């Protein structure tokens, strides 16, 4: 027994000194914060005073748990086993971990007593000169001595009575002050059914401690043995469970340590990123503010320039108007009030002046307009290393000055993508140099106006727009290109869509001899031949066109459309050639 028990006790003592398993080694209630009074052990292995548990708010458990519930079957070892079908529906929450505790039929007092806590409380009281301990027999006076044989704490009166009785005369009595070095001074655990008997045996069938009277009574046919004899088997089973639990504790502690490390790293990373965000934002804000100031200055310069132009034009027109009025008024006065001689005398001067005034060139339109637009989505380059958006544009696109360009402007092939380019200009005919205009394009078959072709408009951001479409059928199509709901120059226009490009069936070669690898039977549509029985063309021989060409139709352009019709005039065998 001693060999098997020492490692078990040693392991437990080691754990209690360094690891908190449940409430072992604790003496104060987590609720009332005082020394434990009748401590009860909950299924979650937390210990609470009986009175404190009774003050908790109970609740009804919705589902009646089965017989395997570990929270309802761990009643006090002093209670009779209850049928598993009679589980309680009343529960409480552990005040430490909030675990649900299903109370047994006997309520809180039917929960297991934490005898380890009782022993710790007693040791704690002994360290305080025994204050708070009352006699185990009379439950009235303070304790002075302890009977080591009965394991009972006795007051002075009960101690004297204990010595006078024959059965207890020779029991060893020890003063409380001499017990301070002890690690265990707990009371004997008595049988709840036979209060005069101590629990010394264990019923294997019922899996619970029993007394001698229980063995000869209710448990007489059950296998029973002394607790000192069965502690090895049951202690070892608990030991195995404990060894299986310890790695989980270590793993969880390691996981929590990793979480702490990651959390610390997370906080540092968040602070670093936040600093980067602040630095970036502050720099970006300064760049935007600087760009804002530049835009406002540019806007002010544009205003000043336009105002100066308008004022200059105004002054010129006012002066011209004054000259015109002077000429008109003087001439009218001369013609209406002057004599014939006076008119003839001043005629030369008046005519010369009026002719000069009539030759003056002037514009009735303002020399500048009020077209100023802010384009927030247009790139404005970089400022302080940041990409900045937003420009001020004074140009306004003029649909009448916009032109269409491209080889596929008036021709296309069925099921092949055709494209052209729209070049936008302002009223002065200058290229806009920017995008962002609302370009509308429509491609409609002339005989199927309700079936428009899908078009794509790509803004090149430089004043040009790439427009593409894919006609599905050959025929005549009408194309509309509008800006600001106005047709551009040349719109609308028609496009002739021809049938799909016919691919070449032969090879594009220099001669038949080279492309066929010297085969005599290979022929070419160019009609050239070679001496020696060769039916195809060869360099420098009769009929060779002198240029690379297609063997199927004889065309010189590699990207051309094949013109071979496959008729009698050009039999298939004539065009055959072999390409290595």
Swiss-Prot record:
Filamin repeats lie at residues 394-497. Zn(2+) 2 binds at residues 191, 194, 214, 219. Keywords: Coiled coil, Cytoplasm, Metal-binding, Nucleus, Repeat, Transferase, Ubl conjugation pathway, Zinc, Zinc-finger. A zinc finger (RING-type) spans 29-98. It catalyses: S-ubiquitinyl-[E2 ubiquitin-conjugating enzyme]-L-cysteine + [acceptor protein]-L-lysine = [E2 ubiquitin-conjugating enzyme]-L-cysteine + N(6)-ubiquitinyl-[acceptor protein]-L-lysine. InterPro entries: Bbox_C, Filamin/ABP280_repeat-like, Filamin/ABP280_rpt, Ig-like_fold, Ig_E-set, TRIM45/56/19-like, Znf-RING_euk, Znf_B-box. Disulfide bonds: none annotated. SUPFAM superfamilies: B-box zinc-binding domain (SSF57845), E set domains (SSF81296), RING/U-box (SSF57850). Residues 281-335 form a coiled coil. GO terms for cellular component: cytoplasm; cytosol; intercellular bridge; nucleoplasm. PROSITE patterns: FILAMIN_REPEAT, ZF_BBOX, ZF_RING_1, ZF_RING_2. GO terms for molecular function: ubiquitin protein ligase activity; zinc ion binding. GO terms for biological process: bone development; negative regulation of inflammatory response; proteasome-mediated ubiquitin-dependent protein catabolic process; protein K48-linked ubiquitination. A zinc finger (B box-type) spans 130-176, 186-227. It is an enzyme of class 2 (transferase). Its EC number is 2.3.2.27. Belongs to the TRIM/RBCC family. E3 ubiquitin-protein ligase that plays a role in the regulation of inflammatory response. Mechanistically, mediates the 'Lys-48'-linked polyubiquitination of TAB2, a regulatory protein of the kinase TAK1, leading to its degradation via the proteasomal pathway and inhibition of the TLR-mediated inflammatory immune response. May act as a transcriptional repressor in mitogen-activated protein kinase signaling pathway. This is E3 ubiquitin-protein ligase TRIM45. It comes from Homo sapiens. The lineage of its organism: Eukaryota, Metazoa, Chordata, Craniata, Vertebrata.
């Amino acid at each position: 027994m001693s060999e098997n028990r020492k490692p078990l006790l040693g392991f437990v003592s080691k754990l209690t000194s360094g690891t908190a398993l449940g409430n072992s080694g604790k003496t104060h209630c987590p609720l009332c914060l005082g020394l434990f009074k009748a401590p009860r052990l909950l299924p979650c292995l937390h210990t609470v005073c009986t009175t404190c548990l009774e003050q908790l708010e109970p609740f009804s458990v919705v589902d009646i748990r089965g017989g395997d519930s570990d929270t309802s079957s761990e009643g006090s070892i002093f209670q009779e086993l209850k049928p598993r079908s009679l589980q309680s529906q009343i529960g409480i929450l552990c005040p430490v971990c909030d675990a649900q505790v299903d109370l047994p039929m006997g309520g809180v007092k039917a929960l297991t007593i934490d005898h380890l806590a009782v022993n710790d409380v007693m040791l704690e009281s002994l360290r305080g000169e025994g204050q708070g301990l009352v006699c185990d027999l009379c439950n009235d006076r303070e304790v002075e001595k302890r009977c080591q044989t009965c394991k009972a704490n006795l007051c002075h009166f009960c101690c004297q009575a204990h010595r006078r009785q024959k059965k207890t005369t020779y029991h060893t009595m020890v003063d409380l002050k001499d017990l301070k070095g002890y690690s265990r001074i707990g009371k004997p655990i008595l049988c709840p059914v036979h209060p005069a008997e101590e629990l010394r045996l264990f019923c294997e069938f019922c899996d619970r401690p029993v007394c001698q009277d229980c063995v000869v009574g209710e448990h007489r046919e059950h296998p029973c043995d002394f607790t000192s004899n069965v502690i090895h088997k049951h202690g070892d089973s608990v030991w195995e469970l404990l060894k299986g639990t310890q790695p989980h504790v270590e793993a969880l502690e390691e996981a929590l340590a990793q979480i702490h490390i990651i959390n610390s790293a997370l906080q540092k990373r968040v602070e670093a990123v936040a600093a980067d965000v602040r630095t970036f934002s502050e720099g970006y804000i300064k760049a935007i503010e600087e760009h804002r100031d530049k835009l406002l200055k540019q806007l002010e310069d544009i205003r000043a320039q336009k105002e100066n132009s308008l004022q200059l034009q105004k002054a010129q027109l006012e002066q011209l108007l004054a000259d015109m009025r002077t000429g008109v008024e003087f001439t009218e006065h001369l013609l209406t009030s002057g004599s014939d001689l006076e008119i003839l005398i001043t005629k030369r001067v008046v005519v010369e002046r009026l002719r000069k005034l009539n030759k003056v060139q002037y514009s009735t339109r303002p020399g500048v307009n009020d077209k100023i637009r802010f384009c927030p989505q247009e790139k404005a380059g970089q400022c302080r290393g940041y990409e900045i958006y937003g420009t001020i544009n004074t140009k306004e696109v003029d649909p009448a000055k916009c032109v269409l360009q491209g080889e596929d402007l008036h021709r296309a092939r069925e099921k092949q993508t055709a494209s052209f380019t729209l070049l936008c200009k302002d009223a002065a005919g200058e290229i806009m140099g920017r995008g962002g205009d609302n370009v509308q394009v429509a491609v409609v078959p002339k005989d199927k106006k309700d079936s428009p072709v899908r078009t794509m408009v790509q803004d090149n951001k430089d004043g040009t727009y790439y427009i593409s479409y894919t006609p599905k059928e050959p025929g005549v199509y009408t194309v509309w290109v509008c800006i600001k709901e106005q047709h551009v120059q040349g719109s609308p226009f028609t496009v002739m869509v021809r049938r799909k490009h016919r691919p070449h069936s032969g090879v594009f070669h220099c001669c038949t001899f080279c492309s066929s690898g010297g085969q005599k039977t290979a022929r070419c549509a160019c009609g050239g031949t070679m001496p020696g029985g060769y039916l195809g063309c060869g360099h420098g021989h009769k009929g060779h066109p002198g240029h690379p060409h297609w063997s199927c139709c004889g065309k010189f352009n590699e990207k051309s459309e094949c013109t071979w019709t496959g008729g009698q005039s050009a039999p298939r065998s004539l065009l055959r050639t072999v390409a290595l």
